Amino acid sequence: FGERMSFVWLDAARYADTNGYQRDTVRIMWRWRDWVIEAFNQNMPYDEFTIEQLAGDLLPDATLSQRIATGFNRNHRINGEGGIIPEEYAVEYVADRVSTTSTAFMGLSISCARCHDHKYDPFTQKEFYELYAYFNNVPEEGKGREVGNDVPIAEVPTPEQAVRRDELTAKIASLEQQLSGPDERLDALQTAWEQEQ
């Protein structure tokens, strides 16, 4: 069900597994795609669907799922061409977020308001840049990478990896606690050695 229902949303949100410029390198967005499919399968309320995609990472005690949802904001094309001016493309990425968000969530094409007030809809250039300011808080570099996703990157382990990570974290904590205090075995060995001298 979710796969058939979500394809229109994935198109509106400009989902792709590649960066979209001349090299069209691979990027890993399938976890966000799967989040959308699962949201449709669970019949997630639209307000939650919207909030989690636009600002899931800003929710108090955001879950991994809510952070994945914000992949919506990272679906824009990414240019990794040599010689680009990163700040120029960072600006383009933010403008793309504004345009895509307005189209997908509000049903408005407001790209023209980037340069002037909208000719037909009550949307001003000032309002475009107010939305721009909201979306200009993603700490990205503006220049893509040769392989993989542009930073910042959310680490999303599989369930098996999460279990293994938790096991290793507990083991590290135990070993660090052992190292933080004196080692009684060494004290006994040192005392024995001193008596032999």
Which residues make up each language-model segment?
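Short, structured secondary-structure elements
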Residues: 1-159
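Long, non-membrane, amphipathic alpha-helices that form coiled-coils
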Residues: 154-197
